[in-house]
Amino acid sequence: MNRSNISACGRPAGVSVGLLVRLEARPGKEREVEEFLRAALPLVESEPETTAWFALKFGPDSFGIFDVFPDDDGRRVHLAGRVAAALGERAADLLSTPPIIEPVDALASKLPRARAHE
């Protein structure tokens, strides 16, 4: 195993914690949930502590977000950020149930490596 991507604490370098968020769209709101998630990308791109972020579609009305952070502080900043605030404002209109937000710990990961400029 290449241990260069593993930190001293045994977790993947650069990533130690994450969030898995499940979103169930109200009937007829599926497209709006998709649009909301796509529009969230620029907001997340402005968060330096969000190492990776994915908007997901599990099925016709089932969506999610998976994101990872270097540490708990980065995760807390994200949870207090603009995407979380926007989701809080729109959840009652867009979602059939409250979002399920599950904190997760990263056991292993493969992230893109920075390439040297030629």
Segment roles from a protein language model:
Residues 16-24:
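Active-site-flanking beta-strand signature of metal-NTP-handling nucleotidyl enzymes
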Residues 22, 42, 64:
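Generic anion/oxyanion-binding catalytic loop in active/binding sites
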Residues 26-28, 58, 70-72:
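Short coil/turn motifs at secondary-structure junctions
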Residues 39-52, 68-102:
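An amphipathic, aromatic/His-enriched active-site/gating alpha helix that lines ligand/cofactor pockets
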Residues 1-15, 51-63, 86-118:
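Glycine-rich beta-strand-turn "strand-cap" elements at beta-sheet edges
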Residues 30-32, 74, 110:
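Intrinsically disordered, low-complexity acidic/polar segments
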Residues 23-34:
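Short, surface-exposed ligand-recognition loops at beta-strand->loop->(often short) alpha-helix junctions
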